[in-house]
Amino acid sequence: MQKVKVLQVCAWVLLLWRCWGVLGYPLDCKDEQGSIISCTSISLEKLLDRVIQHAELIYHVSEESCTLFEEMFVPVSMRTQQNRARNTCITKAFPIPGSKSEIQKISDKWLLHSVLMLVQSWIEPLVYLQKTLDRYDDAPDTILNKTKWVTNKLSSLEQGIVELIRKMLDEGLLAVDHQQTLTRFDVQPEVVESILRDYAVLTCFKKDAHKMEVFLKLLKCRHTDKMSCYIS
């Protein structure tokens, strides 16, 4: 068992090293000659590709981290809490479509603003998650580093989405109040409760990270292949 955990940690180190290398400077984009330029200066197509790349990696890291946390801290008998967590996610009350048919019908404007709401709503909870994970006696550094990495990349993704809204919609932003989403994180829970809560946070974030990726890919499809844009 210990050997398996060591291998898991090594795999995480390799994954994070690759992610840092790929997206070290998320809003600095290379032109055709390889020179670094501001993302505000690149084409809409390249900016959208860059944002999608961010969303893909964020989802991948969130999926792996959720699995690793589950294997290390959550007993099999308690993993059914994941289903309950999906019903109590901090973004559940947001006016964001959930079914495939609803998502297909919403406008480009709401696709972008939905992604922005999701991104902004998760930055502070993930910062808090870093603090709670730091109190775990046997939490590997890779989990802590991963949480910090995702938080930083969410901030970068937020900047990219804001720029996409300006380029594609030529308008300002919708105001989102995050305070109501943070109230449940104010109490210091007992150990088991803390594990289940952190597990719920990771599970909910993984779900929302996947939704961000799906929305952005649907948006790109609408602008490149309008006749065959379906959500799998």
UniProtKB/Swiss-Prot annotation:
Signal peptide range in chain numbering: 1-24
Main localization (coarse): secreted
GO CC field: extracellular space
InterPro entries, per database record: 4_helix_cytokine-like_core (IPR009079), Somatotropin/Prolactin (IPR001400), Somatotropin_CS (IPR018116)
Subcellular location: Secreted
Gene Ontology MF terms: growth hormone activity; growth hormone receptor binding
Residues listed as glycosylation sites in the UniProt record: N145
Disulphide-bridged cysteine pairs: C29-C39, C89-C204, C221-C229
Pfam families per the UniProt record, alphabetical: Hormone_1 (PF00103)
GO biological process, one term: animal organ development
Keywords carried by this UniProt record: Disulfide bond, Glycoprotein, Hormone, Secreted, Signal
UniProt superkingdom: Eukaryota
PANTHER family: SOMATOLACTIN ALPHA ISOFORM X1-RELATED, SOMATOTROPIN,PROLACTIN
UniProt similarity note: Belongs to the somatotropin/prolactin family.
Record's protein name: Somatolactin
Natural source organism: Acipenser transmontanus (White sturgeon)
